[in-house]
Each structure stands twice: as structure tokens, then as C-alpha cells.
Regions:
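Acidic/glycine-enriched connector segments
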Residues: 1-145
């Protein structure tokens, strides 16, 4: 695959998102960072500020998401907008790479766990670097495989 055929879709947050973006920049890969007004952006390269209408397009029921992920999420405007930007990242991506911990129920812990779940729902190839097991895993449709 050629670097000019790749784009790193991210959310401009610190941590793993910023590191993926920095790696993309080092290797000459285009970068699009979905964000919203008022978000604290760690990456400014390729910043794409979503409109309110675009954010609404990525809206997901918190009740549905909580049931799917087996955890409770805050019902705040800021959290909803973060979820909506994650939806846009996954919707635009062809393959999804996240960092976190794979749980016994096959969900992934951490903010990127939501991206992994969206990827599974959108039938996108998804890869998780499990920080506990120090290795990459791929979702095969039924389970995570090393």
C-alpha cells in the first residue's frame, strides 16, 4: 500500500490519537482530525471542525451504547460530541486501529473501545493493541484473534 493511498482519521485528542497522528505525519500520511467547537485539540494538522448538523448525523443512543458496551456513560453535551466525532472517524475509515484492553465480554476498555464497537457494527476490519497482553488482535467476526 502506498502512503498517498492512506489517511489517518482521528479525533485530535491527546494520548493514542495524538500518537497515531504524529506517526502519520512522520511517514507523510494525510491526517483528518474530526473535532467540534470547544474541544481541546492535541493535534491541529488536518483539523476538520464538524457542524452541528454533521455532529447530529453521528448521534447514537446512549442507552443502546451502554447496553452494547456493558457500562454507563455520562449524558453530557461534551461526551455526546466526542461520541459523534468517533462515529465520523469510523464511518470514514476503511480499517480501524485502536489501543486499549480487550475485556472478557469482547468489548474494549478506553475511549477507543467505542470506536472498536462502531467498527464491528459497521463491518470494518478492526485491530486492537491490547495493552495488558502487549499484542495486536483482530476481530474475525466472532472473536479477537492474535
Amino acid at each position: 500500500m502506498k502512503r498517498e493511498d492512506c489517511i489517518c482519521f482521528s479525533g485530535s485528542a491527546g494520548g493514542a490519537e495524538a500518537e497515531f497522528g504524529a506517526a502519520a505525519e512522520r511517514y507523510g500520511i494525510d491526517e483528518v482530525n474530526f473535532t467540534f467547537e470547544g474541544h481541546n485539540n492535541a493535534r491541529l494538522r488536518g483539523l476538520r471542525v464538524l457542524t452541528k448538523a454533521e455532529l447530529r448525523h453521528g448521534d447514537v443512543s446512549l442507552g443502546y451504547l451502554s447496553k452494547l458496551m456493558h457500562r454507563k456513560y455520562p449524558d453530557t453535551p461534551m461526551f455526546r460530541m466526542v461520541l459523534q466525532t468517533i462515529w465520523h472517524q469510523v464511518d470514514n475509515g476503511q480499517e480501524i486501529f485502536v489501543i486499549g484492553k480487550i475485556n472478557p465480554d469482547d468489548t474494549v476498555t478506553g475511549g477507543t473501545g467505542i470506536a472498536a464497537e462502531y467498527a464491528r457494527l459497521f463491518n470494518r476490519p478492526v485491530y486492537v493493541f491490547d495493552q495488558v497482553r502487549s499484542g495486536w488482535f483482530r476481530w474475525n467476526g466472532d472473536a479477537w484473534e492474535n
